[in-house]
A protein has these predicted regions:
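Negatively charged, low-complexity tracts enriched in Asp/Glu with abundant Ser/Thr
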Residues: 1-30, 69-113, 152-166
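Compositionally biased, intrinsically disordered low-complexity regions
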Residues: 8, 29, 41, 46, ...
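Intrinsically disordered, low-complexity regulatory segments enriched in Ser/Thr/Pro
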Residues: 45-86, 126-164
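Short acidic DE-rich linear segments
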Residues: 168-175
């Protein structure tokens, strides 16, 4: 994992959160993500809407996207700017799901410290294949998360962001 300019630290959490937000905006489903030397390759299903009367429901097509390092840095900047505005994400079925799911998976990966990642999602469940750093890094490890696991991780995520503030604590700043 590379360090992205402006990122407070080298982390999968923020990178995947940004990619997930982009995928939510596109309405992409059933995601496959693989790390490449210069970024990430993502495949998923997208429903394309047609004006044809015989195609009222739209057509599901498989799309492949390549996110280069510069794209990821831009997505991260856009996500940070968007967060403070309080605007709801565009309606795309489960809009916002991939942003939050990818974020908690990224946090899990940050704890594992892999040097290479691959994962896929189907119906909200994820299978990860990680190549660990260090001397034991000569074999991939697998991790599986059900939709319920992801929901639980998302629910717990706010408690992991910042240490709880102490009420009534006095500051000694400036002394």
């Amino acid at each position: 994992m590379r360090i992205y300019e402006g990122s407070p630290r080298e982390d999968f959490e923020e990178v995947f959160r940004s990619i997930g937000a982009f995928l939510d905006q596109r309405g992409m489903k059933e995601i496959l993500l693989a790390e490449a030397p210069d970024g990430f390759i993502v495949q998923g299903l997208v429903t394309s809407v047609s004006n044809s009367t015989s195609d009222l429901m739209g057509t599901v097509v498989k799309e492949t996207l390549t996110f280069l390092d510069d794209d990821i840095a831009r997505f991260m900047e856009e996500a940070i700017a968007r967060r403070g505005q309080g605007e709801p994400p565009p309606d795309a079925g489960e809009a916002g799901y991939y942003e939050t799911a990818f974020r908690v998976l990224g946090r899990y990966m940050d704890e594992q410290r892999p040097r290479d990642v691959f994962f896929f999602e189907q119906e909200g469940s994820f299978v990860l294949r990680l190549l660990p750093m260090g001397t034991s890094g000569n074999r991939h490890i697998l991790a599986e998360f059900t939709r319920e696991d992801i929901a639980d991780m998302i629910a717990r995520a706010p408690t992991l962001r910042y240490p709880p503030a102490k009420t009534g604590a006095k500051t000694t700043a400036g002394r």
